[in-house]
Amino acid sequence: MYKLIALSGLLSGLLLSSSVFAEVPSRILFGSCSHQDKEMPIFKSIIQDQPEVFVFLGDNVYGDTEDMSELKQKYKKLGANSGFKNLKEQAELIAIWDDHDYGANDAGKNYPEKEASRQIMLDFWEEPENSPRRTREHGIYTSYTYGEGEESIHVILPDLRWNRDDIAHVTRSEYSNERAPKNMGPYIPDNTNSATMIGEKQWEWLEKELQKPGRIKVIGSSLQLLADFTGWESWANFPADRQRLFDLIKKHEVNGVILISGDTHWGEVSYYDENLDYPLWEVTSSGLTQEWKNVSPNKHRVGQPISTVNYGALDVDWEKQDPVITLGLYDETGDVVNEHRFRLSTLEPYD
């Protein structure tokens, strides 16, 4: 386990909004969408791959309720799963939520039990009682820093639920006749620039996080960020927010950004280099138990998607003078289905 230097509390008199660990991992695995009522044999392969850190990217249980006693029982069922317990003994577990563990399908800022749900979620993931995640007015967003200097990874986990504005959608007939045949969802992007997914306070936090130390910056998004508009939930429904993130990366000359995401019930790798100073990679891993055969179109996809259960990997070979990064997707048996390897220097255009 990693030695914790500071966790969302006081260090040298300064209030921190992140956790700081002394050691840098060489293998981070991640996944999303684990239904507590289903078997989870994929955890056996994950454990065999020996992650140092595992990131749960949302829909970690399928709560879908306003009954908080029911939500607690669903978390309890996940916690009792033998594969989950074994992973917890082996790796550092960190987590953000998505809609189903937040409380309702595709829910946003108007979900009525979000405060109670927050405490149940953070209790399950053993967040300290004095953590700012428990009391912030604008969500459970947080970050983690591993290592320091030339060998460091900064994991940023925004909260895409707490402040998310409502999303417009097409009519039932339009969805059935036009969207569904194309494997697309019912939602419509907000092109007015008035709607937001995370809210202004969280944007202020995120801008500061992007400027913090960390040679590799992993943004763990519960929803896809680079993919084309699919009609399902994603950053594409909030194009102003999506562009704002790209602009902040350029404005502050942030090197080393890599994106990981969940939600979709299929896995894929995306590559985006439009109007940026270096390419962005995104690995979408979903789900640990959930599957969806009708994969939506995505012009940024590289390699083949996987429509069965899967998990993602970020490996860093720190032994190389120019560290080698390997991004991958793995199936239930631990076999690689999509893998990409590149030098860290390709993500470092800024001095």
Residue ranges and their predicted role:
Residues 1-9:
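Bacterial N-terminal signal peptides that target proteins for export
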Residues 17-18:
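N-terminal signal peptide c-region/cleavage motif recognized by signal peptidases
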Residues 23-351:
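Metal-dependent phosphoester/phosphodiester hydrolase catalytic core
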